[in-house]
Amino acid sequence: MLYPTPIAKLIESFTKLPGIGIKTATRLAFYTIGMSDEDVNNFAKNLLAAKRELTYCSVCGNLTDDDPCNICTDESRDRSTVLVVEDSKDVSAMEKIQEYHGLYHVLHGLISPMNGIGPDDINLKSLLTRLRDNSDIHEVIIATNATADGEATAMYISRVLKPAGITVTRLARGLAVGSDIEYADEVTLLRAIENRTEL
């Protein structure tokens, strides 16, 4: 069906979001049009504020509105351990279990030879620099997803860090192969941390 241009543009904008197909985008567009002006203005204001005010922590790469982020500046955290994750959503998932008290490093992606993504295309150099410049870090826990790309990334990091004498561990296999950390329940994540294995 042909919609007026403003609706068609709104539908097109919604389809750019991950997991949103044309039907859902159409439903969201019509719902948005039915919202009050105040709600639409607040939605737009919050969307712009999130885009403009958030940045990546210069230490760990996590999304933050302060740089460095509140995790990196929290003196009560265990500074001997760094948990390496794919993206900021994984940091949130791990923080929910309230059992990990170390630091994080966000890669912003995974090594994916099939997609032409190599080690230089993710936030890996800053991890290596961070480890080189900080002798307090003794263990790196790799918490990438249990996918082919997650495994490739974990193995690469392990190979690079082993000569430096840093203990490199991997989350235990409470996580199903192909599963995403952000969707795992808290008990599964807790068991995966507790039973991590050395690489």
From Swiss-Prot:
Gene source species: Streptococcus mutans serotype c (strain ATCC 700610 / UA159)
Segments passing through the bilayer: none
Annotated protein name in UniProt: Recombination protein RecR
Keyword Zinc-finger belongs to the record: yes
Chain ranges of the Toprim domain: 80-176
Pfam families documented for this protein: RecR_C, RecR_HhH, RecR_ZnF, Toprim_4
Keywords: DNA damage, DNA recombination, DNA repair, Metal-binding, Zinc, Zinc-finger
Gene: recR
Family: Belongs to the RecR family.
